[in-house]
């Protein structure tokens, strides 16, 4: 009887220990490591290739600061079009990272633009390109011959309101 109980407990213990290992393996394999590269910190992953960095300050219609979320980086692909609607969508995601589903974007600052700075190998100098945010949008240029991970930066104030 004692041998049977010990055998049963051993089998039960082994089942529980292996189930925790397989859950960790399946969780780690579902993360697409191809889109991100590991930074200095083990918990930080930087996008590989072009990315849109959204760094905004949420203000009310009178200009009072309501929210200042951390910047968020979104992978983007050369050749895709970034319209005003898509950019507002990314901004709302950045707001949700700090205050989930609390605020909605009313409008972007009219002077808001997206900028990318890189070293132009042909001109042998640093270049900054600016792209206005419009309904029609702009096509993300392929800068792979100049820089590996070009960061397209949106740093602006955004009029927001509570949902």
Curated annotation (Swiss-Prot):
GO terms for cellular component: extracellular region. The keyword Secreted applies. Potent plasminogen activator that converts plasminogen into plasmin. It forms a 1:1 complex with plasmin, which in turn activates other plasminogen molecules. Keywords: Plasminogen activation, Secreted, Signal. Residues 1-27 form the signal peptide. It is found in: Secreted. Its main location: secreted. The gene is sak. Gene3D superfamilies: 3.10.20.130. It comes from the Bacteria. It comes from Staphylococcus aureus (strain N315). Belongs to the staphylokinase family. This is Staphylokinase.
């Amino acid at each position: 009887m004692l041998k049977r109980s010990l055998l049963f407990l051993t089998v039960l213990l082994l089942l529980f220990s292996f189930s925790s290992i397989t859950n960790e393996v399946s969780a780690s394999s579902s993360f697409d490591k191809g889109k991100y590269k590991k930074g200095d910190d083990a918990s930080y992953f930087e996008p590989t290739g072009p990315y849109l960095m959204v760094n905004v300050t949420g203000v009310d219609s009178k200009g009072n600061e309501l929210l200042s979320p951390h910047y968020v980086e979104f992978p983007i692909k050369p050749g895709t079009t970034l319209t005003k609607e898509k950019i507002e969508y990314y901004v709302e995601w950045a707001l949700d990272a700090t205050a989930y589903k609390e605020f909605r974007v009313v409008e972007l600052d009219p002077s808001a633009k997206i900028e990318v700075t890189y070293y132009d190998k042909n001109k042998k100098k640093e270049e900054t390109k600016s792209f206005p945010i419009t309904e029609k949008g702009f096509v993300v240029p392929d800068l792979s011959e100049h820089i590996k991970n070009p960061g397209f930066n949106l740093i602006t104030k955004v009029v927001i309101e509570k949902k």
